[in-house]
């Protein structure tokens, strides 16, 4: 449609213009454009006059049943029934076809419990990867984990005290209790570091040991517990519905690479000051940050620059590299990206970080440093109880669907207000509601003995629903372009509501229009399923 309007503008005014379409109130039309207002200044004409000229030409198009002009020059277009039906056969565009995209997902650190904030970032990144794949990109899911440093020292301090020099005591911990054990160890270490100067000094030494691993007992315990952590992370993100990663990066393999590049790019990119290497990030919307300390150790910035090099080495045809992190790290990542692009010019414009908001509970912001966390294990247990209390069957697919949707329906960067009972409701804007809506539609189709066929025409009662169905491709294209899954969530919820209104007023099974209506129901069910798949949510046939 944009192309048709652009051609009319070119023919009438010899102007090349990018036509933007919006969805007005359905009573005004299916699409609206302000192209006449855009043309008013370059043409020196009244926008209403321009709009009338464009509208007159658009009325000749058989795809449009009605074209009107409103206000100062807005053009409203209503599609013909056949055009609406044809639009249901459209597929989303694939503007990123052939592009190579690397996206970090499933990235909690080992030696700590995976909590609800980790789940938000992992689910969002996984869904963005789905959108990129729908857009034609070759998507590589990878993960990055901090396996060295202070948090490791805290956990190892408590673990070594717990086993008292006997590594075999770790074998006595049941598999299903390992995550609880690791979480408890981290909390004990964090508390000790805060309360005891002596313990903090010991923890600092144990943190240093995580970089060198030259103590046999430490190394053995470290490797066992690190493996436990990764097993737990993989299990948890699998239960969340995430696609498995293809490459796991860890912080211990990045430092030397990062330090080497930073030193090579000094003073071109970095400044050396009192033995430290500093990036003047304040010039790039970030803050001045030390990447290598005066002690010679690489800090977070050096590690992240090493990671970027590893990804570029593993994926030399990289077109886009995406990370997803909390809003508190947004300025830091602006600095890392700026430093990386200056150091490796081939990556300019290819590195992006998306900042998420907070997950807000009644107890406030979570912190794994104090143990005030909602772990994934606890979260799944609570969802299971809530679904059972609501009369549902708490399968992993249903739990994951409710949880994912609760995160994804919020615009990226917005805070997620988390209420488990609301999240599993079958009557609100929830994943459970949409899964139920899909199962209900499949149930209707299962009751019909009519052959499912694509509608050949529309009755008046069909038009609101079918026009809503026709919006799907545009919504997905918008979500793909901005990498914002909430557009898909909003659309699917509105679509399910529209179908409910249709179904309440129009009998399907046993109606003299049954054959026609099951065709519409089938399209509705297929679109629901496709939209839920983008969100990483299973569309069950029964629930």
Regions found by a protein language model. Give the residues of each.
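N-proximal, solvent-exposed amphipathic alpha-helical segments enriched in charged/polar residues
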Residues: 1-13
